[in-house]
Every structure is written in C-alpha cells, then in structure tokens.
From Swiss-Prot:
<dbReference type="GO" id="GO:0009103">
    <property type="term" value="P:lipopolysaccharide biosynthetic process"/>
</dbReference>
<dbReference type="InterPro" id="IPR023557">
    <property type="entry name" value="ArnD"/>
</dbReference>
<keyword id="KW-0444">Lipid biosynthesis</keyword>
<comment type="pathway">
    <text>Glycolipid biosynthesis; 4-amino-4-deoxy-alpha-L-arabinose undecaprenyl phosphate biosynthesis; 4-amino-4-deoxy-alpha-L-arabinose undecaprenyl phosphate from UDP-4-deoxy-4-formamido-beta-L-arabinose and undecaprenyl phosphate: step 2/2.</text>
</comment>
<keyword id="KW-0443">Lipid metabolism</keyword>
<comment type="pathway">
    <text>Bacterial outer membrane biogenesis; lipopolysaccharide biosynthesis.</text>
</comment>
<dbReference type="Pfam" id="PF01522">
    <property type="entry name" value="Polysacc_deac_1"/>
</dbReference>
<dbReference type="GO" id="GO:0016811">
    <property type="term" value="F:hydrolase activity, acting on carbon-nitrogen (but not peptide) bonds, in linear amides"/>
</dbReference>
<dbReference type="GO" id="GO:0009245">
    <property type="term" value="P:lipid A biosynthetic process"/>
</dbReference>
<protein>
    <recommendedName>
        <fullName>Probable 4-deoxy-4-formamido-L-arabinose-phosphoundecaprenol deformylase ArnD</fullName>
        <ecNumber>3.5.1.n3</ecNumber>
    </recommendedName>
</protein>
<comment type="function">
    <text>Catalyzes the deformylation of 4-deoxy-4-formamido-L-arabinose-phosphoundecaprenol to 4-amino-4-deoxy-L-arabinose-phosphoundecaprenol. The modified arabinose is attached to lipid A and is required for resistance to polymyxin and cationic antimicrobial peptides.</text>
</comment>
<keyword id="KW-0378">Hydrolase</keyword>
<keyword id="KW-0046">Antibiotic resistance</keyword>
<feature type="domain" description="NodB homology">
    <location>
        <begin position="2"/>
        <end position="260"/>
    </location>
</feature>
<dbReference type="GO" id="GO:0036108">
    <property type="term" value="P:4-amino-4-deoxy-alpha-L-arabinopyranosyl undecaprenyl phosphate biosynthetic process"/>
</dbReference>
<dbReference type="InterPro" id="IPR002509">
    <property type="entry name" value="NODB_dom"/>
</dbReference>
<keyword id="KW-0441">Lipid A biosynthesis</keyword>
Amino acid sequence: MTKVGLRIDVDTFRGTREGVPRLLEILSKHNIQASIFFSVGPDNMGRHLWRLVKPQFLWKMLRSNAASLYGWDILLAGTAWPGKEIGHANADIIREAAKHHEVGLHAWDHHAWQAHSGNWDRQTMIDDIARGLRTLEEIIGQPVTCSAAAGWRADQQVIEAKEAFHLRYNSDCRGAMPFRPLLESGTPGTAQIPVTLPTWDEVIGRDVKAEDFNGWLLNRIQRDKGTPVYTIHAEVEGCAYQHNFVDLLKRAAQEGVTFCPLSELLSGTLPLGQVVRGNIAGREGWLGCQQIAGSH
C-alpha cells in the first residue's frame, strides 16, 4: 500500500465556484480526504499574461493548450477590470469543503504573491498572509492550521514570515519528504510538507501525452523514494480534466495507492533543512526547493 498526500490548489474565482464542488463530489464518491488550499482575495490571474514575453512561460502555455485547459475567463481575470474577490463570494463552497477536508490558505491574491512576493519586505509579507488567514477564518469559522505558498514561491523570507502565525505545517516548496526548516535563529521552524510529484501542466506536451498521464504518474508514485505528495488544481482536474482525475483515482485504488490529507504525513521526527530558490523542469521562474541539512 502506497500512501500519497493529496493537495488541491484553488487559484481563481471559477476554480472555486465550479471546480471545487465537482472535486468534493468526486472525492466523496471515492471516500478520499485531501488538503484544499484556497485563494480568498481578488482574482487577478489574468495579469500573468505579460509573462508570455518569456519563452519558457509561452511554451508552457502552448503545450498545455492553456485556453482550453483554463478557459478565457481565467486567463483574462483582473486585466481590463478589477478582479472579483473570491472568498466571501464563494463562502458556502469553502465552508462545505472545510466540513470534510483539511482547509488551508493558498494566498490572499495569488497573482500578487507569485509575481511580487520575492521582492516584498517581511512586514509586507506578514500583512498579506494575515489578511488571507483572517478572511479564510471568517469564512470557515475556525482557526486555519496550514498554508501553501502560491506557485511555490517561497524562500527563507517566507519561512520566517510564516513563523508569526504558529501554523501546524506549511507546504511551500518542492522536495522529497517532510522536514523542519532552520530559522535565522538556528532553531527549527514550522514543519514543511513538500510536493514531490510533477503537476499536470508541468509535463503535458513535454514528457507525456494527456492520454498517457495517469499511467505515467502512477509509475512515478510507485518509484517515489520519499513521501509522495501530489498537487491538483481546481481549475484543471475540477473542470476540463475531471474525467481524467476520476480515472486516476480508480486506477490508483487498483494499484494499492491511497490518498490522504497532508497532515497525515507528519511524524514526530523530521529532518532539518532549508527552503532555497531553485528551478524545476516545466515551470517558469524560480520556486522554493527543499535542501536537507540533518535530522532533529
């Protein structure tokens, strides 16, 4: 039996309004619980279009057929008009998710975090996180205990900023296994649960065809030597590719692969490490990567 942490990122208004209810229904039918990370502020994701001038991002958009994958409402959100606020407009959906799954903060403004957080000072970052946590807690009526940085944009600055909120864990980086990042003070910080497996948009059209993806991913899961964690997106697996996701769950069950919330992957003893800026194939720009230092 192989246990895989299932992380669901919700980046946009449409992903929340349409994708999350579909995913909740699918997960219920398969008796699966997951960790769902919500963006709760304005949907400005269309402002990423300026990145098309970067060849790596343009190629990713072309090979993943982004217009079909996400829809033009997502690709243009917040460009010619102010982005719609996601959280309170979809409060009932978010509350329903929190009844059955582990719910955490993805971002206040996903676009702002992904595009600008690397240049923010620490107080700006703390204020942004606080705004998102406060909004999500108002919606679900209980404390938020986990978070996942938008676009995996995380480094030591992010690690230090999030310590102010005393969360149970964060999932801010890519890596191999849960660990505790060292703080500037030399003490271990809040547990990190890295994503270990590629996402759909990172590999489709580059490493694998869409129709072969599920078999390819299950093979990667079985070969994962660390603690497997897989991320899906409400805008992808909850919308255009929901049938592919259903097929993945069926095939996973047949192969003895089970999915769980990320918190179930935590153990009492975790290695020490750091979150450093790095790059991975299929994703444009830098992102947080795990660097192991020792054990604690």
